[in-house]
Amino acid sequence: MNPLRTLCVMACLLAVAMGNPQSGNRSGRRSNSLDNVEQPSNWVNPREVEELPNLKEVTLKKLQEMSLEEGATLLDKLYHLSQFNHVFKPDYTPEPSQIRGYIVGERGQKIEFNLNTLVEKVKRQQKFGDDEVTIFIQGLPETNTQVQKATRKLVQAYQQRYNLQPYETTDYSNEEQSQRSSSEEQQTQRRKQNGEQDDTKTGDLIVIQLGNAIEDFEQYATLNIERLGEIIGNRLVELTNTVNVPQEIIHLIGSGPAAHVAGVAGRQFTRQTGHKLRRITALDPTKIYGKPEERLTGLARGDADFVDAIHTSAYGMGTSQRLANVDFFPNGPSTGVPGADNVVEATMRATRYFAESVRPGNERNFPSVAASSYQEYKQNKGYGKRGYMGIATDFDLQGDYILQVNSKSPFGRSTPAQKQTGYHQVHQPWRQSSSNQGSRRQ
């Protein structure tokens, strides 16, 4: 029997025995307010706990086959129930040799490495670190088509930004090859025909495929974020010390659980060097299921000079917690975003949005406004400075920002955000929006 299930049944029975009058009440689960977060025993009964699947049976494929609401409900239950007595221990740490990745070479080739050989491979690259260095830590396995596509879009976008050659077509499946003339590429071609100037620069891209070392939900939930972050942080220290890569040009990006790994890596870098990385970007950071006892973990503002986060499934695979200097919530905090049919697609939209903003000419595709709810944004009652989500985010932005996105690519609306009439405040409590469908409590 699932040990989580056994323990949580006992906990729920105890809650019922204590006579909690709100037991079984789910009326608040569609609220996007962060006040008075419900206890698990208030809305999960023992029968439902018994029906939870074994953790090894929960896969990205199964989550992708569920509706957005079904997948989010399952993850909600697993998360809340996991908090009883720290059921999940963060004890899954893939060996550095198991975590593979690649450097994108000048000719578009993949220069493969594992974490043990990363620094040596970088040393062999001419002019590495002369300009920007972007390190993307992928948080979910690329065996999933949604993850694979989002990662490919991000890599292609940086190839354009850094004037690198595209991958050989043999790197992609037939279905992917047929999609190469997507709306994003067509948009770039139209700009070139109109004589618009690309805002490109040189740089280097490293992809760390942490997600490929995660095989099931049990490993996902028990990922040792602290240890993995320390390992990657130490590699960053080696890059600055032995390859002379200045920390001021390093941009660390993490998707899903890797967003928290990136945060720890930033802190480890600071502990070892006394300096901070320039920027960390979190692409739909997840809830943390396995937490070390009596110790804070995961991403937080202060892990780099500037930390920004894009939340596309705040009540699905992601989290509604404010983790960064500026937190962006496309269409407000909710289970998913327009056009996303399941929780996997919803969480990967953050990567797709960021990739779109990286493409030359698209840097300001995602205008946003500081607001405390989607309803407030729609009624032009937001407050403060307008800003852009994505690669062009201003480093002086703070607080919660909301914007509208399209359901299909191009996702950015590219038009100025609505003028707002309120006053600027930082990280205000969420205000409930009755029109914000699919949202739930964390």
From Swiss-Prot:
Q: What would be one Gene Ontology cellular-component term for the protein?
A: extracellular region
Tell me the disulfide pairings in this chain: none
The record's section on SUPFAM superfamilies has: alpha/beta-Hydrolases
> Gene3D superfamilies from the xrefs?
alpha/beta hydrolase (3.40.50.1820)
- rRNA processing: is it a keyword of this entry? no
Mind listing the UniProt keywords for this protein, alphabetically?
Phosphoprotein, Secreted, Signal, Sulfation
GO terms, biological process:
lipid catabolic process; sex differentiation
Recorded GO molecular functions are:
serine hydrolase activity
Ranges for the region named Disordered are 21-44, 165-200, 408-442
Q: Which residues carry this modification: Sulfotyrosine?
A: 172
PTM field: Tyrosine sulfation occurs in the female only and plays an essential functional role.
At which residues is Phosphoserine found?
A: 31, 33, 82, 173, 178, 181-183
What up-regulates or down-regulates this gene?
Answer: By beta-ecdysone; in males.
- Tell me the null mutant phenotype: Viable, even in combination with null mutations in Yp1 and Yp3.
Indicate yes or no for the key word Chloroplast.
Answer: no
Where does the UniProt annotation place the signal sequence?
Answer: 1-19
Q: Give tissue specificity per the record.
A: Synthesized in the fat body and ovarian follicle cells and accumulate in the oocyte.
Localization, per the record, is: Secreted
Q: What functional role does this protein have?
A: Vitellogenin is the major yolk protein of eggs where it is used as a food source during embryogenesis. Vitellogenins and their receptor yl/yolkless are required for maintenance of microtubule plus-end orientation towards the posterior pole of oocytes. Involved in polarized localization of germ plasm components, such as osk mRNA and vas protein, to the oocyte posterior cortex. Receptor-mediated endocytosis by yl/yolkless is crucial for actin reorganization, mediated by osk isoform A/Long, required to anchor germ plasm components to the oocyte cortex.
PANTHER family per record: FI01450P-RELATED, LIPASE
The entry's family comment says: Belongs to the AB hydrolase superfamily. Lipase family.
Name of the protein: Vitellogenin-2
**Source organism:** Drosophila melanogaster (Fruit fly)
Q: Which gene encodes it?
A: Yp2
